[in-house]
């Protein structure tokens, strides 16, 4: 059965792959929709630690890149496409790699333009100390699966009871992973340009403290005194497992761990006020810290 499934996915890859923007080679979860977040991973064996290594990456959505479990994403919020223009990234990952097994993992979420199947294009290239080059790309040998408890459709939904950070480790073993296919022909075509648009990386610019707080038994309103682009971050302690918070309409479900943090993981908003509501039984005392994370424009 396993080999039959692999044969089907490989056939889909051949049938659905076609001319790519900027030479990109797209991969997609075989059964995509408008809101699911998808996890991608692949283990590569390197003969020695590379002298230089880079990743070229493009996406129709928002992505986060991990190398050997370390976050290698240049931006806090990494947007793959803007106004139908593909934002290509080149990321130096030399310091993250080692001799032997190396795992590359990507967390994908849909972007503003709802493109179901142009999810990820990734190339790994570089050279060793003896000047021998190497090259790999994301293809049908990678693995992918939907993120359980995570979706993004204008607003984020994140269930921290289900999420495990181990998915991006080499030792992680779990069922439900399948091979990706190529992009489908009914998907969005991005604008061709002679030169790639200048892509500025958004960084943490300032951590803001609340200017004013209004609380009641059902929730609160946090006023930071001025509008900023970024996210609020709540540090939560001793919340009951399954407690649900809504932050400006974005949903966060508590894991029940002693300390956890609720914030926007996929997108940034330009806001001055944040309205938070919560389940019965949650208390203001469960929130030990409130911060506004302002990012550079």
Say what each PLM segment does.
Residues 1-21:
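Bacterial Sec-dependent N-terminal signal peptides
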């Amino acid at each position: 059965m396993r080999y039959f499934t692999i044969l089907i996915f490989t056939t889909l890859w051949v049938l659905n792959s076609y001319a790519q923007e900027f030479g990109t080679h797209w991969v997609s979860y075989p059964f995509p929709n408008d809101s699911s977040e998808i996890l991608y991973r692949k283990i590569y064996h390197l003969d020695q630690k590379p002298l230089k290594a880079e990743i070229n990456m493009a996406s129709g959505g928002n992505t986060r890149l991990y190398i050997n479990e370390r976050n290698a994403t240049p931006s806090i919020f990494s947007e793959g496409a803007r106004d139908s223009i593909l934002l290509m990234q080149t990321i130096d990952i030399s310091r993250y790699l080692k001799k032997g097994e190396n795992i590359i993992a990507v967390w994908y979420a849909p972007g503003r333009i709802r493109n179901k199947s142009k999810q990820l294009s990734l190339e790994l290239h570089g050279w060793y100390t003896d000047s021998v080059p190497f090259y790999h790309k994301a293809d049908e040998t990678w693995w992918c699966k939907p993120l359980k408890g995570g979706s993004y459709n204008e607003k984020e939904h994140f269930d921290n009871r289900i999420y495990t950070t181990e998915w991006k480790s080499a030792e992680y073993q779990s069922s439900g992973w399948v091979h990706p296919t190529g992009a489908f022909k009914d998907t969005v075509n991005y604008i061709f340009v002679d030169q790639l648009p200048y892509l500025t990386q958004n960084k943490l610019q300032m951590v803001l403290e609340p200017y004013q707080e209004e609380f009641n038994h059902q929730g609160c309103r946090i006023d930071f005194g001025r509008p900023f682009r970024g996210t609020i971050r709540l540090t939560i302690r001793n919340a009951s497992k399954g407690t649900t918070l809504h932050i400006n309409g974005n949903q966060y479900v508590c894991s029940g761990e002693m300390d956890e943090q609720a914030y926007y993981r996929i997108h940034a908003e330009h806001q001055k006020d944040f309205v938070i509501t919560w389940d019965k039984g949650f208390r203001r005392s469960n929130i030990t810290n409130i911060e506004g994370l302002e990012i550079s424009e």
